[in-house]
């Protein structure tokens, strides 16, 4: 029974400290993402979102091209 009380106290202390350490900025983010400025939602976060979007698209395109290359290479017979 004592172990149960100790574990509950530990969980309570860990979960409450993390929650109180950061300020709530949901209203700021909602205001940023809901304003009508013509940008797509995945680019409204700024330069970091733009870079992340471009890197993701480059990796997707590269992976698609590489998979097509591997399919083409595997479809032809190889000399032995």
UniProtKB/Swiss-Prot annotation:
Residues 22-46 are mitochondrial matrix. Coiled coil: none annotated. The chain crosses the membrane at residues 47-75. It comes from the Eukaryota. Pfam families: COX7a. It is a single-pass membrane protein. Keywords: Membrane, Mitochondrion, Mitochondrion inner membrane, Oxidoreductase, Transit peptide, Transmembrane, Transmembrane helix. Its main location: mitochondrion. The keyword Nucleus does not apply. Residues 1-21 form a transit peptide. GO terms for cellular component: mitochondrial inner membrane; mitochondrion; respiratory chain complex; respiratory chain complex IV. It is found in: Mitochondrion inner membrane. InterPro entries: COX7a, Cyt_c_oxidase_su7a_sf, Cytc_oxidase_su7a_met. Component of the mitochondrial respiratory complex IV (CIV, also named cytochrome c oxidase complex), the last enzyme in the mitochondrial electron transport chain which drives oxidative phosphorylation. The CIV complex is the component of the respiratory chain that catalyzes the reduction of oxygen to water. Acts as an assembly factor that specifically drives the homodimerization of CIV complexes, mediating the formation of mitochondrial respiratory supercomplexes (respirasomes) containing two CIV: supercomplxes with two molecules of CIV show improved activity. PANTHER family: CYTOCHROME C OXIDASE POLYPEPTIDE 7A, CYTOCHROME C OXIDASE SUBUNIT 7A1, MITOCHONDRIAL. This is Cytochrome c oxidase subunit 7A1, mitochondrial. It comes from Bos taurus. The gene is COX7A1.
């Amino acid at each position: 029974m004592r172990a149960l009380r100790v574990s509950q106290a530990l969980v309570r202390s860990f979960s409450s400290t993390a929650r109180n350490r950061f300020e709530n900025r949901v209203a700021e983010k909602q205001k940023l993402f809901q304003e009508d400025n013509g940008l797509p939602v995945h680019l409204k976060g700024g330069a970091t979102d733009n870079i992340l979007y471009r890197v993701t698209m480059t990796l997707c395109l590269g992976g698609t091209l590489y998979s097509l290359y591997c399919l083409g290479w595997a479809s032809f017979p190889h000399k032995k």
